[in-house]
């Protein structure tokens, strides 16, 4: 599903760009989306 793949990339990028643990809670690790 292309939309899911797009979201996966977005969430991964979100986690990479947020250093604060509290902010990271809003991002899901890539592996949980498979």
Swiss-Prot record:
GO molecular function, one term: toxin activity
Cofactor annotation comment: Binds 1 Ca(2+) ion.
Tissue-by-tissue expression: Expressed by the venom gland.
Principal cellular location given in the protein's record: secreted
Enzyme class per UniProt: hydrolase
A cellular component annotation (GO) from this entry: extracellular region
Active-site positions on this chain: 18
Presence of the UniProt keyword Plastid in the record: no
InterPro entries the UniProt entry points to: PLipase_A2_dom_sf
Cofactor section: Ca(2+)
Documented EC number(s): 3.1.1.4
SUPFAM superfamilies reported in the protein's UniProt record: Phospholipase A2, PLA2 (SSF48619)
Post-translational modification: Contains 7 disulfide bonds.
Subcellular location: Secreted
Keyword Transit peptide assigned: no
Binding-site residues, Ca(2+): 19
Record field: catalytic activity: a 1,2-diacyl-sn-glycero-3-phosphocholine + H2O = a 1-acyl-sn-glycero-3-phosphocholine + a fatty acid + H(+)
GO biological process: arachidonate secretion; lipid catabolic process; phospholipid metabolic process
Its job: Snake venom phospholipase A2 (PLA2) that strongly inhibits platelet aggregation and has a strong anticoagulant activity. PLA2 catalyzes the calcium-dependent hydrolysis of the 2-acyl groups in 3-sn-phosphoglycerides.
Protein name, as recorded: Phospholipase A2
Originating organism: Pseudechis papuanus (Papuan black snake)
Taxon lineage: Eukaryota, Metazoa, Chordata, Craniata, Vertebrata
